[in-house]
Amino acid sequence: MVPKLFTSQICLLLLLGLMGVEGSLHARPPQFTRAQWFAIQHISLNPPRCTIAMRAINNYRWRCKNQNTFLRTTFANVVNVCGNQSIRCPHNRTLNNCHRSRFRVPLLHCDLINPGAQNISNCTYADRPGRRFYVVACDNRDPRDSPRYPVVPVHLDTTI
């Protein structure tokens, strides 16, 4: 019985360690506020092809992000969406700070097509342009954010 207990404790520690590593892969780089990281990941008026556009994000994350959506609009326009009625976030149902855009915007959705890439310089993406509504989570600004916007987008929850 002792070996089984010992083995199960090691398995638990390994699992917790892996969860910590995976969680850190999704974390924003510490030098950015949540709003700044949102802008880097999701705002681009004229994004280049996905494989090129994703390099900046992947360089901060040190891995190939599976998918990403660039909204072809301005940060100020997304901030204005934060003023729309609050709704429960469709993909993260524990959050009630989401807001749906009133208008469709052009966007570029990127899907990783070589998930086994060992080096971030080899990440390759398929481009899926579109025009959709979007839902963002918004929070009060971080003291490091511009005081121009008291409430800022921090998470792209979904596109519709």
Swiss-Prot record:
The active site is at H42 (proton acceptor), H155 (proton donor). Its EC number is 3.1.27.-. PANTHER family: EOSINOPHIL CATIONIC PROTEIN, RIBONUCLEASE. The gene is RNASE3. Coiled coil: none annotated. Belongs to the pancreatic ribonuclease family. Substrate binds at K65, N66, Q67, N68, T69. This is Eosinophil cationic protein. It holds the Pfam family RnaseA. The record marks Y60 as: May be involved in LPS-binding. Glycans are attached at N84, N92, N119. The keyword Flavoprotein does not apply. Interacts with bacterial lipopolysaccharide (LPS) and lipoteichoic acid (LTA). In vitro interacts with and insert into lipid bilayers composed of dioleoyl phosphatidylcholine and dioleoyl phosphatidylglycerol. In vitro, tends to form amyloid-like aggregates at pH 3, but not at pH 5, nor 7. CDD domains: RNase_A_canonical (cd06265). Residues 1-27 form the signal peptide. InterPro entries: RNaseA, RNaseA-like_dom_sf, RNaseA_AS, RNaseA_domain. Cytotoxin and helminthotoxin with low-efficiency ribonuclease activity. Possesses a wide variety of biological activities. Exhibits antibacterial activity, including cytoplasmic membrane depolarization of preferentially Gram-negative, but also Gram-positive strains. Promotes E.coli outer membrane detachment, alteration of the overall cell shape and partial loss of cell content. Residues 28-72 are annotated as: Required for nearly all of the bactericidal activity. GO terms for biological process: antibacterial humoral response; antimicrobial humoral immune response mediated by antimicrobial peptide; chemotaxis; defense response to Gram-negative bacterium; defense response to Gram-positive bacterium; induction of bacterial agglutination; innate immune response; innate immune response in mucosa. One of its GO terms (cellular component) is azurophil granule lumen. The modification 3'-nitrotyrosine is found at Y60. It is an enzyme of class 3 (hydrolase). Keywords: Antibiotic, Antimicrobial, Disulfide bond, Endonuclease, Glycoprotein, Hydrolase, Nitration, Nuclease, Secreted, Signal. Disulfide bonds join C50-C110, C64-C123, C82-C138, C89-C98. The record marks W62 as: May be involved in LPS- and LTA-binding.
